[in-house]
């Protein structure tokens, strides 16, 4: 395809914005068609109660892969980031707590109040993740190799990665091979004896998934996240103005590179002729001829809603149908008239003050059994009566999100299945919100009386309002059989599809985890290579 030909992208989520940016830099003419009135996908800021705004779905940034951040230069487009320290505050119902700082030695000092042994082990664990980071990080940036006929580039990438792994030594190589299939609960138990410490770290392996800490392969998910950020508890980066400001800056960077963006442009159908895409048709009937189409939406929506399934090979269609994408995460936003008090946050623990201690993420899930019980309910079609929560109070870093002196509390809620066994989400939405408030009140007893308003976003909402089939925040389950060369399906994990010049760039492609931009950048590289 000659340089300068039109490539049309479906959806304006973060990965699509990254893909379009690099396509423009590569000399193509990308056009993004976004069905909503603004871009951002799951990384947007919206008013959920009069005067109160929140990052509706995602509430922290990836972190964005460092090379992408350097290329897009988001700070030039008024993207201002905050990186709170400590990153995580983890209370227990009994009034104890841990704080996780950037400084591992300082964190270890707090852990020593629970276990002197674990204080030393925490340093060892952090060093282990830091040791693995360069190797695991490489995997985020490569295209999964072709299984049947790997290209010279595939072999070179595997050689580089293999050489790095070999450099770790036989013991560490054995550790990696053993750890990947393990349950996160077993993995953390090899290092720690303190239940709260185990739970906070194991939670990285289950966040956003339909798995509990005793599920096989959750250590692989934990290590996948460590490949993006080697800190034991992960990232806690926020954008001033909410994540909508982050994706707005991405859109401005893409426009500056030559990307055209149209909002309120819902794609109804992908046109195909003789096995190749020819363009798109919008819901209003408007047609867009295209030499190539890149879908930033999930595979099931792409192949079963935007394409005629009869154009697909039956084996491929069955694999896509079997791609697990039913989510178990909900989101609850609270409009508060004051900052809640957490009794576990004592002067002895919060040496830098309560505001700093609460400015990162707040982990609600005091032990492994608690996390597993929260997961159990979803296996049988119910939501957790005592859910695992990943909480932020973004107004501590950005007071503009609420009226003066008031606050926003935002909570990811697990586990809440897409399909309920009894009732429906419209009927049980309030019950889920009440459950979250009751759970939070265990740790912050004054919170219920501070609430002015509440918004509950269910997995069903993620499908109907945001277009995530099955309500999965990562477009598909992060399980061992749906990672790397099998994401989304075997034989088609290289961002291409069986339809010529139709590509995928969303979170259902490798590596498919959080706001790192990696799926989008990898897809752009393969698209440029295929079209030149």
Where are these regions (language model features)?
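N-terminal glycine-rich phosphate/pyrophosphate-binding loop and immediately adjacent elements
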Residues: 2-148
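FAD cofactor-binding and catalytic pocket of flavoenzymes
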Residues: 74-78, 306-410, 461, 467-488, ...
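Active-site/ligand-binding neighborhood in enzyme catalytic cores
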Residues: 130-257, 468-483
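A glycine-rich dinucleotide-binding beta-alpha-beta segment and adjacent secondary-structure elements
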Residues: 194, 198-214, 365, 381-394, ...
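Glycine-rich loop(s) and the adjacent beta-strand/alpha-helix scaffold that form part
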Residues: 236-249, 253-257, 270-271, 281-346
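Flavin-binding catalytic cores
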Residues: 313, 339-340, 376-385, 425-464
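A conserved FAD-binding loop/helix module that cradles the flavin
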Residues: 507-528
């Amino acid at each position: 395809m000659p340089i300068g030909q039109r490539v049309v992208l479906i959806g304006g989520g973060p990965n699509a914005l990254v893909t379009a940016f690099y396509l423009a830099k590569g000399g193509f003419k990308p056009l993004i068609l976004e069905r909503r009135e603004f871009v951002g996908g799951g990384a947007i800021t919206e008013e959920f109660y009069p005067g109160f705004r929140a990052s509706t779905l995602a509430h922290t940034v990836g972190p964005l892969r460092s090379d992408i951040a350097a290329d897009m230069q988001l700070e030039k487009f008024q993207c201002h980031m905050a990186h709170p320290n400590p990153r995580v505050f983890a209370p227990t119902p009994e009034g104890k707590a841990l704080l996780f700082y950037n400084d591992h030695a300082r964190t270890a000092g707090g852990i020593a109040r629970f276990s002197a042994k674990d204080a030393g082990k925490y340093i060892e664990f952090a060093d282990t993740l830091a040791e693995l980071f360069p190797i695991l990080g490489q995997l985020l940036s490569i295209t999964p190799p072709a299984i049947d006929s790997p290209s010279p580039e595939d072999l070179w990438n595997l050689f580089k990665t293999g050489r790095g792994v070999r450099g770790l030594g036989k013991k560490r190589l054995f550790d990696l091979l053993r750890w990947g299939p393990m349950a996160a609960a077993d993995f953390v138990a090899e290092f720690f004896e303190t239940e709260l410490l185990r739970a906070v770290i194991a939670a990285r392996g289950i966040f956003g998934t339909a798995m509990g800490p005793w599920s096989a392969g959750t250590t692989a998910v934990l290590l996948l996240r460590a490949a993006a950020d080697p800190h034991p508890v992960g990232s806690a980066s926020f954008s001033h103005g909410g994540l909508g400001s982050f994706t707005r800056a991405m859109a401005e960077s893409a426009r500056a590179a030559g990307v055209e963006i149209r909002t309120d442009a819902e794609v109804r159908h992908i046109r195909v002729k003789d096995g190749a895409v020819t363009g798109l048709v919008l819901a209003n009937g408007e047609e867009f001829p295209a030499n190539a189409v890149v879908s930033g939406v999930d595979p099931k929506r792409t192949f079963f809603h935007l394409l005629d399934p009869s154009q697909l090979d039956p084996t491929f269609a069955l694999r896509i149908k079997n791609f697990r994408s039913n989510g178990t995460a909900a989101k609850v936003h609270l409009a508060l008239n004051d900052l809640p008090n957490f009794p576990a946050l004592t002067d002895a623990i919060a040496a830098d003050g309560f505001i700093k201690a609460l400015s990162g993420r707040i982990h609600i899930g005091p032990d492994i059994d608690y996390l597993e019980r929260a997961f159990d309910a979803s296996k049988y079609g119910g939501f957790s009566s005592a859910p695992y929560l990943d909480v932020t109070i973004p107004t501590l870093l950005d007071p503009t999100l609420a009226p003066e002196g008031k606050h926003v509390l935002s909570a990811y809620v697990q586990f809440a299945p897409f399909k309920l066994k009894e009732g429906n989400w419209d009927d049980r939405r309030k019950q889920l919100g009440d459950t979250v408030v009751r759970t939070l009140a265990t740790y912050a007893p004054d919170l219920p009386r501070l609430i002015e308003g509440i918004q509950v976003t269910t997995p069903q909402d993620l499908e109907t309002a945001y277009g995530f089939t099955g309500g999965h925040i990562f477009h598909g389950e992060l399980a061992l059989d749906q990672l790397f060369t099998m994401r989304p399906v075997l034989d088609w994990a290289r961002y291409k599809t069986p339809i010529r010049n139709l590509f995928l760039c969303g979170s259902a492609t490798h590596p498919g985890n959080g706001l790192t931009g990696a799926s989008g950048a990898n897809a752009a590289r393969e698209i440029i290579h295929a079209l030149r």
